[in-house]
A protein has these predicted regions:
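Cap/lid segment of the alpha/beta-hydrolase catalytic domain
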Residues: 109, 135-158, 266-271
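Primarily recognizes the serine-hydrolase "nucleophile elbow" in alpha/beta-hydrolase
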Residues: 166-223
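Short beta-strand/loop motif that positions the catalytic acidic residue
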Residues: 228-230
Length: 297
């Protein structure tokens, strides 16, 4: 395992370039050329890119063999989407009664080890958690994020949305849950949470992390309370939130916004240097408390 690096080890301009690269706004060559101008050469730029790539051994906060949980891969129908989908489910071990559900929605690269660990973290907090893999129609997460991003870019976004709706309904109707289901998502997945809040009147609660705001004309349809988590340095995503916030307020929606100053987009993902331990821990604690408040009782 390589030495853990922190966001402060890199110039902010490098982190902005990396954000553009991993979200498809620039390609690898553009990143390396831009980084070379910042760090003084192509060899150094390549080393920077390698240092920013995820190290998934860092993600295991709740091991798969943790005695508090039971985990398995499941399939479920998506009749209006891709047909049959696959996901990773974790439940509290020895639960004698149904628990609330949490749908965990991945970033723009499929169901990677970080998201699987997030699923286990919610199960360890006494929820039934499901992390679907949007890449199921293309064979599933391929084992690395670069290929995962390329695969997810091939998928039709409208079809993917139907697959997320199907996952919500599968979890809502599962014998292990109470029927009360919240959704948490990161990056692309945060945007999906916002869209599900518009789409699903029975969504119990939504916690989007640094995800795109939905179309404002859908805001009147939102019924679920929202806890919006934003990174203070995330100029790209944050630019869409003033109007979203105004629309939520104007329509009397229940929501809170937490901005983690000094944190970068992706701060919850503990496999890359953009991880901010303090912000991630606080955001996770807030999310669990939020779901406890709105999904139990």
């Amino acid at each position: 395992m390589s030495e853990r690096r922190k966001a402060g080890d890199f110039p902010q301009e490098i982190l902005k370039l990396f954000d553009g690269y991993v979200h498809g706004f620039i390609n690898r060559r553009d990143f390396l050329e831009g980084a070379a101008r910042v760090v003084g050469g192509g060899v150094a730029a390549l080393a920077v890119l390698e240092a920013l790539e995820p190290e998934y051994a860092w993600a295991e906060q709740v091991p798969a063999d943790d005695t508090r949980i039971r985990q398995e891969y499941v399939t479920y129908p998506s009749p209006d989407g891709s047909g049959t989908m696959r996901g990773y489910m974790a439940v509290p071990q020895g639960a004698s009664e149904p628990k609330p559900g949490v749908l965990v929605i991945h970033e723009n690269r499929g169901l990677n080890p970080y998201i699987e660990d997030v699923v286990r973290r919610f199960a360890a907090a006494d929820f039934v958690a499901l992390g679907p893999d949007a890449l199921t129609p293309l064979g599933g997460y391929p084992g690395n994020d670069d290929e995962g991003r390329e695969l997810q870019g091939r998928l039709d976004r409208d079809v993917m949305m139907e697959d997320w709706v199907a996952a919500f309904r599968f979890l809502r109707d599962h014998d292990a849950t109470t029927g009360r289901v919240g959704a948490v998502g990161f990056c692309y997945g945060g945007g999906v949470v916002n869209q599900l809040a518009v789409r699903l009147p029975d969504l119990g609660a939504g916690a989007p992390f640094y995800g795109s705001a939905p179309s404002l004309d859908g805001v009147p349809s939102i019924r679920a309370p929202l806890m919006i988590q934003l990174a203070g340095l995330d100029e790209r995503v944050n630019a869409g939130y003033p109007e979203y916030r105004e629309a939520l307020e104007a329509n009397g929606k229940a929501f809170t916004v937490h901005v983690y100053e000094g944190a970068n987009h992706g701060f919850h993902n503990d496999t890359t240097p953009r991880y901010d331990e303090d912000a991630a821990r606080l955001a996770q604690e807030r999310t669990i408390a939020f779901f406890n408040e709105h999904l139990r009782g």
